[in-house]
C-alpha cells in the first residue's frame, strides 16, 4: 500500500512537471512574439520618422531654392544698376553671372573696384564670370578682366555706339620714306612738316648731312590734302556775263530773219545768237522742239525749271506748246532773278506780241514768270 502510494505520487509529479513545462514554453513563446512585435514596431516607426525627416529636408531645400531664385529675380535689375553705376557687385545667397560688357559700360568705370569669387565655379570661356559669395572674396580691378586682351588694347580702341562695342585700329603715327637722289634731311623735314632733329632722333642719325640713296627713314604721317574743286571766281563769272550781255545788246531793237521765212520770228533771234557761238543754227519745226531735235552734249546743258533754279544771262528759255499757238516760244535770258524772289526773269524776245511775221516787232526786253514746264539751255561758250 505504501509502495502504490509512492508510485502514484511519482506519476502525479511527472504530470505536474509536464504541465509546468508546457506553461513555461507557452509563456516564453508569447514573450518572444511580444518582443518581436515590439522591435518590429519600433523599427517601422523609426523608418517612418526618417522618411518624414528626409521629406522635410527635401521640402526645405526646395523652398530655399525657390526663395533664392525669386530673390535673385527681384534683385536682378538692382544688381545690374549697381554694376553699371557703382562698379561693385553685391551678390545674394545664390550664384550670379556677371557679363563683362555690362560691367564696363564706359571708360570712367574701368578703374572701379568689383568683388568677385576667389575661385569662381562654372566659369565660361567667354566674358562671363560666376560670382559666389559663399566662398572667400577679394577685390580686383575691372581692368584685370581684360588681361587676355592686353596686347590688342595697345593698338586698338574700344568705342561704344548704338549697336554695342566695336574696335578700330589706330592710325599709324609714322610712315617709311625712301631716300632718293638729291634728298636732304632739311628738304624731307620741310616736306613732312617736321624738324631735322626730330628725324635724326627717330632714325638714330648722328650726322644730318650724311644720308644714303635707298635709306629707309621714319617720317611723320601727313594727312591727305584733297584738291579743292575748281570754281569759277566771281570776277571771271561777272566778266563772262558782261561779255554776253554786251553782245545781246547789239541784237536789241533790231529785227532778225535767220532763215528768210515768215518775217522776224522768235526762232530767228535764237538762231542768230547760236550761230554766233557755234557757227550753226538750231533744228526744230517749232520753238518747243529745240530741246529734243538737237544734240547738246558738247555745246550746252539742259535744265528743267524747279523752285530753286535760277537762269543765267545767255541761257535759252523754251516755252511749251501752251504758247505761240502750239509752236511754243523761245528767248534769250538777260536777268535770271528780276524780282529778287526767283519768280520772274527778264529776256530778249522777238515776236512775243505776234508782230514778227509783219516785221513790226523787233527784239526787245520782256519780263516773264517762271513756268513749271519751261526748259532752259545753258551754252558752254560765252559770247
Swiss-Prot record:
Please classify the protein's predominant subcellular localization into one broad category.
secreted
* UniProt keyword Cell wall biogenesis/degradation present: yes
Q: Name one GO molecular function term.
A: hydrolase activity
Instruction: Specify one Pfam family.
Output: CHAP
Give the signal peptide, or none. 1-49
Gene3D superfamilies according to UniProt:
endopeptidase domain like (from Nostoc punctiforme), LysM domain
Q: Which SMART domains match?
A: LysM
Entry's NCBIfam families? Answer: YSIRK_signal
UniProt name for this protein = Probable cell wall hydrolase LytN
* UniProt organism field: Staphylococcus aureus (strain N315)
Q: What is the lineage of its organism?
A: Bacteria, Bacillati, Bacillota, Bacilli, Bacillales
What would be the name of the gene that encodes this protein?
Answer: lytN
